[in-house]
Amino acid sequence: MIELIVSDRCTNCGDCIAVCPTNVLDAGETGPPILARVDDCQTCFMCELHCRADAIYVAPDCDRRVSVTAEEVVALGHLGQYRKHSGWDEWTQQFPNEQWLMETVFRRAGEAAARRSEKP
């Protein structure tokens, strides 16, 4: 679930607001976006992936909020970690994202299930 936006890193570009499928964020009047509807967060990480400033921290727990501070997530190196390990933007060459390979895995699993159901 989205936990925080580090205001001194945020560039107020609005990309996180635009990509959020559940409309969790609202534009701030003078600063970073506001976490307006946190309970609607699906923990899809889209906001974190699209944040080039690495200002957003989404905790992997989708059922409850986790109490963290900006200082903690910075010290632990959590900011930008999901983007990096997903091979997003500048990390493409160093950490290639091979999740597209799952398409083949799912297709083969579906074919195997169909064959299994055809047998008497």
Annotated model-derived regions:
Residues 3-9:
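N-terminal pre-triad scaffold of radical SAM enzymes
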Residues 4, 15-32, 46-64:
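Iron-sulfur cluster-binding cysteine motifs and their immediate structural context
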Residues 7, 22, 38:
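Aromatic-flanked redox-active Cys/Sec active sites in thiol-based oxidoreductases
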Residues 34-35, 41:
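Amphipathic, hydrophobic secondary-structure cores in small proteins
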Residues 46-120:
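Flanking helices and flexible, charged tails adjoining ferredoxin-like Fe-S electron-transfer domains
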